[in-house]
From Swiss-Prot:
The gene is Smco1. It comes from Mus musculus (Mouse). Disulfide bonds: none annotated. GO terms for cellular component: membrane. InterPro entries: DUF4547 (IPR027875). It is found in: Membrane. The keyword Transcription does not apply. Keywords: Coiled coil, Membrane, Transmembrane, Transmembrane helix. This is Single-pass membrane and coiled-coil domain-containing protein 1.
Length: 214
């Protein structure tokens, strides 16, 4: 074997070792890219979770700090509770087979997180009312904070005390998410009242409550 042949073989072996190392490095880089992407996704998810929690905390703080008088609070509470009842009632209308297992709106909210069909129906109901999840979250927060002392006022009583509830909410509720949710509740109920005849518009709240079977 000549010196040139030996040198050529050694060079080929060296190139093969370099090629193997490059392939190994390429595999490692791909694994690092996957790890980086996973970490990025986890970071983004964590950031969104923190942002969502911060936004929810702000709504809670705003709901607790509302400067409404007792009468004003009851009027706003009346719109909120009527919208929540409407959402629950509509869900039961669309899911008659689940009436017994969905006795409250809270049960609907829990079930939709686990059941795709319930979630899709819930999304369609929100679309019907022109609501988004953040609106419902704001309304539920308001209800939790003030539900223990809130009193429902009928529509004619509300009009007698305050002519423009939306104006009052806009002026007094500074948190944008809470303000948007409350304003949307007023719009939904007022639009519904306009669509009803005078006799139906005087229906008491209990007639709006969905039937619940034992």
């Amino acid at each position: 074997m000549t010196h040139e042949t030996t040198t050529l073989i050694s060079l080929k072996e060296a190139m093969k070792r370099v090629d193997n190392k490059l392939r190994a490095l390429d595999t490692q880089f791909k694994e690092l890219d996957v790890t980086k992407d996973n970490l990025t996704l986890r970071f983004e998810h964590h950031s969104k979770t923190l942002a969502s929690q911060a936004a929810q905390d702000e709504i809670w703080t705003a709901a607790l700090a509302l400067g409404f008088t007792s009468m004003e609070l009851n009027i706003v509470y009346s719109y909120v509770i009527e919208v929540l009842i409407c959402l629950h009632t509509r869900m039961l209308q669309k899911l008659p087979d689940l009436v017994r297992s969905l006795p409250t709106l809270a049960s609907v909210l829990r079930r939709k997180a686990k059941n795709k069909h319930v979630r899709l129906v819930w999304e369609s109901v929100l679309q019907e009312y022109g609501l988004q999840e953040r609106d419902v979250s704001a309304l539920c927060t308001f209800f939790i904070v003030h539900g223990n002392k809130g009193e429902h006022y009928a529509a004619n009583v509300r009009r007698m005390y305050i002519k423009d509830v939306s104006f009052m909410i806009t002026n007094m509720v500074k948190n944008q998410a809470l303000q948007d949710g409350l304003l949307r509740a007023v719009q939904i109920i007022e639009k519904g009242k306009q669509a009803q005849d005078p006799e139906n518009s005087r229906a008491p709240l209990k007639e709006l409550m969905p039937p619940v079977k034992d």
